[in-house]
Amino acid sequence: VESKLAQDIKRIDKILKDELPKYDWPISTSPDFIKDNGWFSAGRSYIKAILCIYAHHQPKSFIDDSIVNINNYWLKQANSKNYHHFFPKAYLTKLNMDEQKINHILNITIVDDFLNKREIKDKSPSKYMDKFKKANLHLSETMKTHLIMNLDDFGVWADNYELFFEKRAEVISQEIEKRIIKQDVDEKPQVIIIDDLPEEEFETE
């Protein structure tokens, strides 16, 4: 049986020749698939793909609209200084939210270390974002770089995590859709890839 590495090499060779490689499994871009399979671990290939989309948008600092300095070394670890739960873990835990829904790629944003550790901590989004709104006159545009397209519509000012979760899933779904060349196999339902396991397990802040 041909190894996965050998298969990948053949596919890359096809891409280099401007040919479309074939895959044996379907790719789902639906919001429901993201919600069901987005538990956060920086070692999972599925999560890495979505993190690449986040980074592609050059996320900016909530507080001053400057581009976040993304450290490639830290991005390999789920406890990275760059990873922030937009609805903080401590805040959602107090509301008895399910852990798998708290520690989810849809709740992850890429920020700088100072912002994550000292400015946000366990505050609700409406509280810490109100502070940033006064400091950052471009906050609405800043948040679009995090694929949070509208603070009201995403339930941020109402601290509505369920609404935020749904809305961000829709946006991430659209972003994945833009990058996928649909093939016949994609007509089949996708199941989570069995070997999409984390390389290492860490806790996020």
Regions found by a protein language model. Give the residues of each.
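A broadly conserved detector of short glycine/acidic/proline-rich loop/turn motifs that flank catalytic sites
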Residues: 57, 87, 92-93, 114-116
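Short conserved micro-motifs at the rims of enzyme active sites and ligand-binding pockets
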Residues: 92-95, 119-126, 154, 184
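Short Cys/His-centered divalent metal-binding micro-motifs
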Residues: 102-104, 108-134
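C-terminal, well-folded lobe of enzymatic/effector domains
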Residues: 140-205
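Histidine-centered nuclease catalytic patch
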Residues: 73-107, 124
